[in-house]
Amino acid sequence: MYIANLRLQNFRNIPIKSFDFKNSINFIVGKNGSGKTSILESIYFLSHSRSFRSSQLNRIINHDSDEFIVYTKAYNPDEVVISLSRKKNSNNISKLNSEIQKNHTEITRVLPIQLMNPESFNIINSGAQQRCKVLDWGAFYLDKTFLKIWQQTKFLIKQRNSALKQNYPKAYINGIDKKLCEFADILDYKRQAYFIKLKPKIYEVLSQFNPDLKLDIDYFRGWNSHKSLVQVLEESFDSDNRYNVTNHGPHKADIVLTINHKPIQDIFSRGQQKLLICAIKLAQGEIHNSENENKCIYLIDDITSELDNTHTKTLFSYLKNLKSQVFITTTEENKIIDFLDLDSHIIEI
């Protein structure tokens, strides 16, 4: 997949604008506040039906309007047209090839996105939920049945927590547990299947950034690996009931990053953590591209401020080898001169 044209109308500070892109590395150059990140945000919005910058979606609509529209013409290799619009205090309206979508799942599947921005580098310190999203992104594209299993598991955990808060009888909660454990085991299997592919690829990519960086990468399914979830939920029932929350299960899954059994955030420098996140994101894209004709698109916001010149060069080299379409924002064109080639495309904002 690559985006050939993007049209924005009343999106953030862009009243109306059309952009043409290449199926290569596209550099978006402009001053702070010029709308560079808004272009990345609009592409991300097309894929996910949400923003990576704000949960207040009405704020995305230009203050002089009551609706924004994002439209793109992409190729995979056939032409694909995706549009998304939103009026103030209303819901998003998504269209794929002019057909209104009941949900956004198919568009997300058609338009796979990897985002790398300053907030991405907080994955290591943000808790298990953010790291688990790495697994779920990959499993979603690897296995078409994953989403339904994930949704059903999430529903059952929510139902169980609600039952705990309302002091439902234990027999009722046991009924929920039976269904939950069935779906949790399937979800665990699918996450593990992706993790088995991801782990060696992370090591491979990380070695290209810094061969001296060593760490252990392990998968935690969310409960004791030596016990069934049925047993764990039974043993933890009194505690769960006391605090009105399910403390064990697939919602607690994690990618555990350690050195000598110590969390890497206590050992890795900020710079080393950035390299690890780059390796994770690139590994995900490489796995995706190797198993899908529909290649992953990278959105990279102001990466030159996060990495030094040597590691930025390694990143660009790897991205070129992935043959993914890439969008990179920067405030200073002179910072990217060393990385330009005949296939590069510069858009000045």
From Swiss-Prot:
For this UniProt record, the keywords arranged alphabetically read as follows: ATP-binding, Cytoplasm, DNA damage, DNA repair, DNA replication, DNA-binding, Nucleotide-binding, SOS response
Please name one Pfam family that this protein belongs to. Answer: SMC_N
Q: Which GO molecular function entries does the Swiss-Prot or TrEMBL record give?
A: ATP binding; single-stranded DNA binding
- Where along this sequence does the record place binding of ATP? G30, K31, N32, G33, S34, G35, K36, T37
* Gene Ontology terms: cellular component: cytoplasm
Q: Name one GO biological process term.
A: DNA synthesis involved in DNA repair
Chaperone among the record's keywords? no
- HAMAP family per the record? RecF
Primary role: The RecF protein is involved in DNA metabolism; it is required for DNA replication and normal SOS inducibility. RecF binds preferentially to single-stranded, linear DNA. It also seems to bind ATP.
Q: Which NCBIfam families match?
A: recf
Q: How is this protein named in the record?
A: DNA replication and repair protein RecF
Lineage of this protein's species?
Bacteria, Pseudomonadati, Pseudomonadota, Gammaproteobacteria, Thiotrichales
